[in-house]
């Protein structure tokens, strides 16, 4: 759900700012990438989208429903620990646990996760295919492009994606040289995207195949088809 909202905000940012007010725009949802870009290329800090990340947007949405709840982010990304502790952005996230860490907890308590019964009430069927695609390299940019084309079918959007911090740095060097004016830049710190994060357990290639299937099962494709699309106005503050 947070990925859906992040998509919409970044799409609107790009349409408003590029190229009228800035030569390019970079995505913001990978904290390791955005921190690196801002530190090594401070002159372009304002060109990285100010959109809140999927983690923060999802947490704020849940807090709206239940202000007293405690929120834990569970995923493959160790850099989310840094993001959740930032004081510049209110994250609403109380705990960040990687897949590797939570598996250690299960093993310590002798919990066999594979044998736990499914609960139909906990099915996640309210996200778009584009939102689910955030976890792989190229997925964020594709979601943003699809949202832009939904709002303005004739809008041309050129995209370049980088995976791994070394390639992300090269991408920013090219942008500095003026090679990517008018582009949407997507950076992913982990080669392959979030599915290959430092705290993951599964083989990234297998995860990518499973994600493709998961996207195909989504009840909608475009982020703008989602019922929560109008939630951004009150979640950003």
Residue ranges of predicted features:
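Iron-sulfur-associated redox domains of electron-transfer enzymes in respiratory
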Residues: 1-237
């Amino acid at each position: 759900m947070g990925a859906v909202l992040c998509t919409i905000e970044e799409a609107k940012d790009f349409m408003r700012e590029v190229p009228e007010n800035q030569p390019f725009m970079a995505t913001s949802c990978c904290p390791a990438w955005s921190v690196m870009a801002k530190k090594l290329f401070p002159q372009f800090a304002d060109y990285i989208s100010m959109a809140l990340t999927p983690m923060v947007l999802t947490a704020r949405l849940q807090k709206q429903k239940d202000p007293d709840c405690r929120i834990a982010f569970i995923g493959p990304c160790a850099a989310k620990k840094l993001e959740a502790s930032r004081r510049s952005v209110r994250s609403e996230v109380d705990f960040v646990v990687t897949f590797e860490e939570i598996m250690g907890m299960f093993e310590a308590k002798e919990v066999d996760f594979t044998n736990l019964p499914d609960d139909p009430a906990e099915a996640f069927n309210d996200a778009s295919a584009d939102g689910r695609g955030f976890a792989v390299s190229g997925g964020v940019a594709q979601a943003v492009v699809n949202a832009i084309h939904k709002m303005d079918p004739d809008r041309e959007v050129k995209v370049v994606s980088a995976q791994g911090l070394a390639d992300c740095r090269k991408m920013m060097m090219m942008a500095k040289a003026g090679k990517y004016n008018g582009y949407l830049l997507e950076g992913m710190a982990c080669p392959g995207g979030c599915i290959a994060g430092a705290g993951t357990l599964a083989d990234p290639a297998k995860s990518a195949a499973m994600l493709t299937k998961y996207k195909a099962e989504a009840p909608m494709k475009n982020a703008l088809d989602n019922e929560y699309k109008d939630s951004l106005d009150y979640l950003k503050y």
